[in-house]
């Protein structure tokens, strides 16, 4: 609430939200600046140097006049002296004020004098012109002679020493996280360098960058549930791109041999630690080559990015030290499954035989695919994928899941395709393109089911693309690694939200903002789509960001899957009954063992963790909460 009112007899006391008072005071200071003839929001800065340049080039700049601008992060006044630290995108620099050296307030020049410096607050954007010097304590500083206010901040920054702890706030107000946390600022800066390195690498290999449509009359190039929109000017429905692949192939048909696009992709599907509905990819197409060319290309590109954008080749990826200087492994999918299960899917006679393998891998029968090839892929996902730690190129996918790829001449049940796996995570998909228009049309027509148009399994009939192929597409191959997955690897993050500056979240309008701007309050959006760790959940409970209601239910889930020669057990929780939230998913624990685990014992372990960690945290947040622990629909 904006204000709380107590009525003591005839006396009424009103307690105003402290943020309201601070905001009003700062608005008053902005008005005071105007009364002095100074704009609190001038249009231009006279900056000549960034803070880091002043520090790095001190030997050349000492005693010279420079102008530095940035956000005021600290300010300390001691009589006729004052000290401040100003932050820009390169770092921080100290401003040193002597009353007699600072130019007086001057509306014409825009200077704010020492006597009026009280109109400046932490968080304001300021500018100083002065002489580069070193203080008696040895700190490189700027002896201020002219001082300007460039932007009056109306809201105070959170505690810069504690930083932001509430994950909901970090994701919604990433700008605050970056202002307060140098590590976050550097992480997103490094991602821009990564994208620049990709362009440099591809341009150096002779590729040409093209812009391809994000709004498409027919989505294609993959299987995913699309976002639909309506174009009023054309009077028809269209789709946001799930892929740009088919447009790149049109470019190759037009005669451009090496093309690429760095575009936005939209898939109306789930949100978790490695998936987001809107994401970026770099897609390439190379004429007169096959998928083996791209195996070398993608390996070289990752190594170039590591060295160019990050200055190293070793990265901690999901707890594993990966060295991109080492050659990548290459592995046939059928051989990988054979190695882990002892079954060669290439020799299976019936889909029932394939299902028996999945049954031994504890795959639920409801998830059994309809073909041997698709069953092999499911076995790969369960038995092989988690063990692919070192960068690995897995090739030889079944044709059932690869309608756009060219079949292998040696065995047409499989296609010339490979996927990239790093630290157990799929990071890109690549293949030799099917350029036979008759064969491709037959495949598409066989899979075409109009009733599934808006589902994730619909295979569209893009007749315009088929027509383009009939004019002749040369032998072509393409790659398509996701930029967010790459950023997770190179910045050593485990959650995709931490490499997306503006992650997609439900709209939220706080009570303070509703009162301030005269709009309707929209409570904090649920965090059910966030994959929270137990520690994050505890912190949000302790801070009051999450509040348990009178009744909370906790559903533990334990799953086992092979991890190389060992077995991995993973436990997670579903929590219901947190105020204003839906179901919250919590990652619990993982354990790896040589033997087949006792799942009942593992369930008890997870239950004990729930009792000692989750239940205790909920009870501290709300001692009156009744907690029910549920396993497989039954109360334990």
Residue ranges and their predicted role:
Residues 557-563:
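Short, surface-exposed ligand-recognition loops at beta-strand->loop->(often short) alpha-helix junctions
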Residues 623-635:
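A short amphipathic beta-strand at an alpha->beta junction
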Residues 7-524:
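Class II aminoacyl-tRNA synthetase catalytic cores and aaRS-like
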Residues 577-604:
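Intrinsically disordered, low-complexity regulatory segments enriched in Ser/Thr/Pro
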Residues 571-575:
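Short linear proline/tyrosine/threonine-rich motifs used for host-factor recruitment
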Residues 602-619:
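Extended Gly/Ser/Thr-rich low-complexity repeat segments
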């Amino acid at each position: 609430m904006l204000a709380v009112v107590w009525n003591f007899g005839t006396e009424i006391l009103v307690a105003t939200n402290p943020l309201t008072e601070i905001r009003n005071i700062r608005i008053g200071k902005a008005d005071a600046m105007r009364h002095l003839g100074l704009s609190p929001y001038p249009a231009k800065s006279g900056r000549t140097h960034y803070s880091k340049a002043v520090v790095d080039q001190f030997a050349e700049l000492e005693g010279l006049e420079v102008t530095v601008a940035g956000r005021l992060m600290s300010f300390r006044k001691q009589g006729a002296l004052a000290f401040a630290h100003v932050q820009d995108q390169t770092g921080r620099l100290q401003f040193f004020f002597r009353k007699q050296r600072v130019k007086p307030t001057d509306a014409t020049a825009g200077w704010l004098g020492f006597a009026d410096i009280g109109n400046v607050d932490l968080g304001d954007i300021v500018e100083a012109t002065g002489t580069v010097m070193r203080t008696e304590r040895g700190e490189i500083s700027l002896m201020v002679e002219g001082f300007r206010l460039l932007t009056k901040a109306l809201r105070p920054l959170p505690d810069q020493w504690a930083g932001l702890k509430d994950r909901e706030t970090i994701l919604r107000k990433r700008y605050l996280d970056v202002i307060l946390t140098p590590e976050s600022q550097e992480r997103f800066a490094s991602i821009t360098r990564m994208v620049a390195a990709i362009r440099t690498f591809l341009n150096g290999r002779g590729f040409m960058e093209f812009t391809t449509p994000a709004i498409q009359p027919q989505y294609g190039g993959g299987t995913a549930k699309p976002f639909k929109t309506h174009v009023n000017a054309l009077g028809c429905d269209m789709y946001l791109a799930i892929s740009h692949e088919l447009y790149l192939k049109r470019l190759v048909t037009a005669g451009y041999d090496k093309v690429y696009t760095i575009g936005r992709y939209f898939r109306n599907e789930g949100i978790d630690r490695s998936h987001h509905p809107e994401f970026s990819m770099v897609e390439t197409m190379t004429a007169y080559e096959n998928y083996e060319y791209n195996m070398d290309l993608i390996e070289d590109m990752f190594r170039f990015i590591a060295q160019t954008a990050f200055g190293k080749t070793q990265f901690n990826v999901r707890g594993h030290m990966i060295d991109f200087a080492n050659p990548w492994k290459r592995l046939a999918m059928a051989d990988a499954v054979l190695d882990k299960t002892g079954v060669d899917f290439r020799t299976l006679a019936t889909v029932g035989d394939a299902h028996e393998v999945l049954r031994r891998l504890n795959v639920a029968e409801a998830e059994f695919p309809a073909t041997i090839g698709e069953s092999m892929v499911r076995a790969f996902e369960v038995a092989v994928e988690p063990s692919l730690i070192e960068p690995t190129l897995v090739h030889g996918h079944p044709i059932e899941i690869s309608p756009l790829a060219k079949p292998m001449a040696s065995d047409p049940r499989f296609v010339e395709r490979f996927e990239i796996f790093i630290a157990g995570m799929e990071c890109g998909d690549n293949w030799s393109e099917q350029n036979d228009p008759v064969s491709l049309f037959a495949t598409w027509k066989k899979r075409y089911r109009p009733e599934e148009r808006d589902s994730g399994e619909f295979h569209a009939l893009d007749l315009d693309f088929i027509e383009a192929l009939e004019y002749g597409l040369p032998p072509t191959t393409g790659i398509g690694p996701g930029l967010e997955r790459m950023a997770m690897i190179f910045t050593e993050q485990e959650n995709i939200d931490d490499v997306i500056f503006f992650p997609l979240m439900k709209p939220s309008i706080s009570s303070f903002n509703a009162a301030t701007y005269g709009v309707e309050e929209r409570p904090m959006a649920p965090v059910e789509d966030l994959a929270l760790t137990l520690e994050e959940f505890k912190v949000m409970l302790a801070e009051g960001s999450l509040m348990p209601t009178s009744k909370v239910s906790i559903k533990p889930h334990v799953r086992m899957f092979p991890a190389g020669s060992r077995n991995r057990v993973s436990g997670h929780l579903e929590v219901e009954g947190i105020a204003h939230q839906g179901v919250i998913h919590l990652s619990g624990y993982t354990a790896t063992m040589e033997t087949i685990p006792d799942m009942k014992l593992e369930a008890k372990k997870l239950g004990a963790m729930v009792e000692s960690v989750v239940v205790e945290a909920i009870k501290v947040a709300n001692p009156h909460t009744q907690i029910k622990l549920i396993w497989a629909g039954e109360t334990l």
